[in-house]
Amino acid sequence: MKKILQRMDKPILLISIIMFAFGLIMVLSASSMESYMRYGFSPYHYFIRQAIFLGVGIIPFIFIIVFPTSKYKHLINLAMFGIVGLLIGLTVWGSVAKNAQSWFSIGPFNVQPSELAKIIIIMFLAMYYDKHKDELDNQWVLLKPILLCIVIFVLVAIQPDLGTAAIIALLTIFIFYAVPMTKKTRNIYNKIFLGGILVILSVLLATGGSFLRSYQAERLNFRDPCERYQEESGYQLCNSFIAFKNGGISGQGIGESTQKYLYLPESYTDFIFPIIVEECGLIVGIVILVIYMILLFRIIKIARTATNIHNSLIAYGVFAYIFLHLLINLGGVMGLMPLTGVPLPYLSYGGSYTISLMVAIALVERVAIETNTKKEKVLRKS
C-alpha cells in the first residue's frame, strides 16, 4: 500500500480530500434549515447521510487503486449490460422525484443508475477501443459501442432526465474523439456531428420545443429570471443571483446565509455554489474555480502520459465527466445556460453522484499508478 500511495498523483489526492471535506461542511450549512424543519428538528440529517456516502465511496476507491485495471476488464461488458437492465427496470419499478423516474428506493436511500452509467460508459469505451486498437480504420468497429451508449442515452432521456442525458451524450462524443483515428476518418465524423447538431437545432426552432414537458421548456428560458419570479426556473435563478450579491467579496460567514432559509430550492445540491459564495465570498468562489482548473490540468496530464489506449481514454473520460458537470452546473446557477439539475463535483449533496465521483477519481489515480510503475521499471532497466 505504501508504494501505491507513493505512485498516486498527490495533487489530485490532496484536492479530493480538501474538496470533499469542504463540501461536507457546506452541505451541513446549506441544508441545516431544511433538515431541521423536515426531519425531527435536527440540522444534521443531510450532513450525516453525505458522510455515509463518502464512507461507502472509500470502499470502491481503495479497491480500484489497489488492483490493476486489467484485473476487472472482463467485467465491464457485464456491467454495461447490467446498467441497461437497471435503466429499463426504472420504467417499471423506479421512484419518481423532481418530475423524473430516475431512482430505485432501497430502504432510506435512493440509487440513481444513470449516475453509475456515466462511469461505466467511460470504462466500457476505454476497454473496447483498446481491445480493437488495430481495427480502428474499420467504421463498424468504431461505431458499434456507440450504439449501446445511444440506448443508454434514450433510456435516461425518457425518464426524463435531460441534464444527465446530455452529459452522457457529450461524454460519449468526447471519448470517441479521443480515440486515435486517421485524419480522414475524423473529418467524416466532424461532418456527421455538425450535421446532427444542425438537425437538433432545426427541430427545436421548428417545433418551439413543443415536444418538451412544460417544466422542461420553462427551464430552457434562463433570461431575466427576476422578471419571471413566479415561474420555477425564474424563482430559482433569481434567488441564486441574490445569494451571489449577498456574498460580496468576503461573504457573510459560514452558516450565515439567508437564501438557505427555504428561499433557494436545492441549496445543498444543484445550487450549493451560490450558497458558498454567499457565506464565504467571491474570493473563495474564485479559489474553488482555480482548484477545479488545477484538477482538470492534472487529469489531462495523466491522460497524455498514459502507457496505453485503455488508460488514456479512462483519464480523458474522467476529465470530460468532471468538466461537463462543472460547465453545466455553474453555467446554470450563473444564468449562462438552462438549469438541468446537475450536481457540482465534490460539493453537492447526493449519494449516487458522490460515490460515482470517488470511483472516477480512483480510476485516474490507478492510471497514474500504472504509468509511474512502468516508468520505474524502465529506469531500473536503464
Region annotations inferred by a language model:
Residues 1-16, 47:
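N-terminal membrane topogenic signal
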Residues 222-273, 280-284:
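TM-adjacent membrane-interface loops and short helices in multi-pass inner/ER membrane proteins
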Residues 1-2, 27, 329-382:
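A juxtamembrane structural motif centered on a specific transmembrane helix
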Residues 17-32:
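Alpha-helical transmembrane segments of multi-pass membrane proteins
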Residues 32-38:
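Juxtamembrane/transmembrane-helix boundary motifs at the membrane-water interface
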Residues 17, 21, 39-233, 274, ...:
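Hydrophobic alpha-helical transmembrane segments of multi-pass inner membrane proteins, especially
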Residues 4-6, 141-142, 261-264, 306-307:
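Helix-boundary and loop/linker segments of multi-pass membrane transporters
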